[in-house]
């Protein structure tokens, strides 16, 4: 809401957002990028936000993880006992007895592991959830305390929401259950080696030589992965900005048929994100391959060396195997840490930017409690020799030694042309910025010496673009004062003349206002903003074009309200309109950052050559109504009016806001008060009905083009899966060899060693292949889903975006987080599933060939393992669904607050926003904690069952050996084959959490992809007229906004507009004037009745073509964060479509060429987010040029000149007059000067056309609506 300051950009604006030339800018960006690549936070810093209970949870979780990790080495010891029991008692009657004792120990171990595993998972998941929540709110809190300059230069709303929804998930992943898993695996590793040294140190030492190699491979991999993932994040952040801009300005996009362009630029950015995800996949695979290669080779070494030890050092075969197995189990667990390491790396990269922001000390700190707090202030304001330039454009001086004194209780008005620096004065008094040198004093004390929060609480700001938050009217007003009572709020609405219209709304004070206050008309929003300022009871009142957005009737009443409020307060007014200014105690005329004149209205008029007199004369030219005085007032007023409106826009120029508002002022009103509610209750079904389940086949079908890639990947995964069970056979063969005579032992140990190396080489080839192929398939799928979903969303009818669950913040979160999750369902999940199936299958085959009876017995028990896995998946699923959308609501709170940071700052509402945010987060956090408990139980239980299965199988084996049905060797072959298979299977269950989240994500994405747009701009069918005359007819229209079905806008509206004529629509704020424009553009369709163009029903015409015939200039122009040239060319559909000469011709017509050429980079100036770097008047002229480039047959002007001061307004009006020739033009306006020359004036009242005719005829109707509107203007300006 860069309203004030940057708007003041007027002057400011002459500079692009950075002072470097574009080329240099790109280079520095590249340098920054390269630095950014490797930026990470040291791991322990991720836990900087843990409190004492978190520390306790982490300690318990770590103890559990260590216990759980140690269970494996202990199991191998028991296993050594088993080999001995079997070996020594093969032919013994005691075998069952001896073995069953060992088996019982297995059961005890299982029980211990159950407890440890529960602690590990539950504690880590819960603490991860808690800390992530704390990081989110700390981040939001620091974002809110930053100085306004930070938002001008370093960040934007899209980025903040992206970090809060996307990056915190990565951080939570890195500090939650993954840490527990990591500790578990590491303790298996360490514990294993300690036991191995006890059993046989020499052999262990030999095997240890491979560890450094393993570690190096792992480290290299982590490094590469981190790099690739931060590169991917950077690319995706750019794509997110495209989403935010497009959906936030959907009406502008639709009107200029810019959907194609948005889709193309989105695709460009997601393709670069795709490339880095492939790199990431390949490097992970390569790392794993190298690790396994080293691992199997070290095995080969151990077997050859172990054979040597048996011959030379008298080791027993059992001891050698024991050492080898322990070392294997230990090192294997090290290999399994890779997903954890990847997650840590991604979390550290994500945390870097967030923590940098959290650490940033703002230059102007709202939370700083130091500084003076006085009993009260008188309210003298002085600017002393102030030098200032906006942080976004440091080389452009706004003030160069500016001074101004306003005594307490006085009303000072600042006038001057657009861009002279008027609003900058207000930004400095609010201390949004500090001057470079010089001082701003209140009661003679430098503003910097006061406690910021306290001094802001003494200042009330009503700006030209009031920003409201997505909550109820009551909550919006309550921002003015902490703990305000309902009585105080009601009194404030009375004073601000808002009580009447609020009472009419179905829910009264509890009516929800939409994103950026879209559900209300401009005048209504302004009155709520005034009520909010009144509630504060400020000593100093700052009015930045406060009444400009109102029509004559409301403006008069609001002005009276303001006059009442201004009594005994120091008031600073920025205005174009003289009527507002004349009664001020002092008028200061500002020109290019200098005060050229000051005095009262009458004093300044005495100097007929003075700047003030010239401004007044300018306004009179625009008018020839009765007396010059009157006229001047009224036109000024209007102009002002306008300004404000325009202003409005920049605030949050979400286009949605924009449009609605524009769309009719009131529509405004009518439009939305419900919408949010609706979003939740009536239309709300959308948010409440569970989304239909998406079948996996449907998602898989999207991956169709990658079938060859997936097939190859599957083959690789299958080979990879078979490696471990094969490994099991080899071990049992080796055990056999170790008990053979010396010469055979020597020969066999060499042979098996070579086989092991071969196994390693296979792994080295297969692993990277598998990862790379699945990364390609998964990456392409994500890219395809993102572009499908975005493409579909962009073509939705405008009404769809009025629902809160489709706001720009929510859509951004859907596209970034959900699409990534879906990949887990197809690519990653498939690769893992195939690998596990292969492990299981090969394990079973090997087991059955060895001893079918034993294999069958074990097989019967396998479902136990399966059931437990299933239970775990089921539990994970239950909770992830709502948690995600709940966080979406919370991120909407953040989106609102960051988008309106000036309002939050001036009302010291940071605490309030934080409370709302925390309230929205409570539910999801509770769910996360519940999920932790249940997952912990499931996880622990799976271990217990596993150990019981082992105990039973060995007991059964002992029985079979006793009965002579199998040999001790085969028992081990069955055991190893199945253990290895089980390890594979248990790995797959670790992926359970992702699949449940992914299904929910898929449902939310497919809900968009499957929805039929009611008014689809991508639909190429429909008639296209050869040549358009421009006759428009509206017959018997009735209309209500879909979001507020209970408020009727049009009842039975009829209006005929002849080709080439100009029709002006007038009426009160909220009568539905702008709605006519929305309907002509087919943003909405009427509920009944017909609209025709040249006799053809609009619905029968091709939508895209229809919109290309119309040029819209709204009261709040939406510009994109791109160059001026690109913004103008947007009218043509793309920068390539418009030639340089067309662009310049359009700019000249719109009277914009002069100011564009005077900026350093001319047409290559970047206008900033929502056009912030330009002043209101400049934005408007660029918007007019954009409409002109289209060469439209029909021109729609919705308060188009309202935001301009007298000088620019005259010139733009001339431009418009030139453009309007021979075009059908529809003008919505408050200001008489604009309306008088129209061929037909239509007065809209109560949903119908009450009067129509020319100015001359209508003015003569005694007591007519038009005549009384004109009369109002006159008196108001008097």
From Swiss-Prot:
Species this chain originates from: Arabidopsis thaliana (Mouse-ear cress)
Where is each ABC transporter domain found?
381-617, 1032-1271
Highest classification ranks of the organism: Eukaryota, Viridiplantae, Streptophyta, Embryophyta, Tracheophyta
Q: Can you say where in the cell this protein is located? A: Membrane
In terms of SMART domains, this protein maps to: AAA
PROSITE patterns in the cross-refs: ABC_TM1F, ABC_TRANSPORTER_1, ABC_TRANSPORTER_2
What reactions does this protein catalyze?
(indol-3-yl)acetate(in) + ATP + H2O = (indol-3-yl)acetate(out) + ADP + phosphate + H(+)
Provide the topology term for how it sits in the membrane.
Multi-pass membrane protein
Q: Write down what this protein is called.
A: ABC transporter B family member 11
| Similarity section | Belongs to the ABC transporter superfamily. ABCB family. Multidrug resistance exporter (TC 3.A.1.201) subfamily.
Report, from the record, the phenotype seen after gene disruption: Slight defects in primary root elongation. Increased incidence of root waving and skewing in response to mechanical perturbation and directional light. Reduced pistils length in the abcb1 abcb11 abcb19 triple mutant compared to the double mutant abcb1 abcb19.
According to the record, the residues making up region (Disordered) are: 1-35, 629-656
PANTHER family the UniProt entry points to: ABC TRANSPORTER B FAMILY MEMBER 4-LIKE ISOFORM X1, ATP-DEPENDENT PERMEASE MDL1, MITOCHONDRIAL
Question: Where is it chiefly localized?
Answer: membrane
Q: Which CDD domains match?
A: ABC_6TM_Pgp_ABCB1_D1_like (cd18577), ABC_6TM_Pgp_ABCB1_D2_like (cd18578), ABC_MTABC3_MDL1_MDL2 (cd03249)
- Is Transmembrane helix there in the keyword field? yes
Q: What role does it play?
A: Involved in the regulation of auxin transport required for pistil elongation.
What gene is this protein translated from?
A: ABCB11
Q: Which domain of life does the protein's organism represent?
A: Eukaryota
Q: Where does ATP 2 bind?
A: 1067-1074
